[in-house]
Curated annotation (Swiss-Prot):
Protein name: Elongation factor P
Key words of the record: Cytoplasm, Elongation factor, Protein biosynthesis
Keyword Protease: no
Protein species of origin: Mycolicibacterium smegmatis (strain ATCC 700084 / mc(2)155) (Mycobacterium smegmatis)
Pfam families linked: EFP, EFP_N, Elong-fact-P_C
Amino acid sequence: MASTADFKNGLVLQIDGQLWQIVEFQHVKPGKGPAFVRTKLKNVVSGKVVDKTYNAGVKVETATVDRRDATYLYRDGSDFVFMDSEDFEQHPLPESLVGRLADFLLESMPVQIAFHDGTPLYLELPVSVELEVTHTEPGLQGDRSSAGTKPATVETGAEIQVPLFINTGDRLKVDTRDGSYLGRVNA
């Protein structure tokens, strides 16, 4: 059990038999009336996001989530195989659990896998990864009135929007949370 004072991003709550992760929270102290906590919760199984408000000081049930360091090894059909960094046990995760994060997975990449009662819940990647552009159209100077972007395919097969000056073979830093271009990596 945890109080609303213990809320933090990433905390997993158990509500009506389902696991919900706190994505955002805000303590609100209105001038009139009792304080409360406004939260944005994400269902760890379905990914559904809901807003929920708690009165300050309310106790809620938390779930024990074990985050383990692992390394991505390879893809086997529709499963992604990861090796636990502590006991070297291999964990195949289904494509449905990995989701769009598959666009940024590289072999030997360090990740974290969250488990609840021995069952994998979700995968966490580093905030940014370095990927090589395998294909993009050349950007022409002077063909636009303002700064623009173009699609580029990176080594994992994902397509991201990049500035016009990016060429095939460039290494990019990409945000794994939303797939956005962060910058070019100097070789």
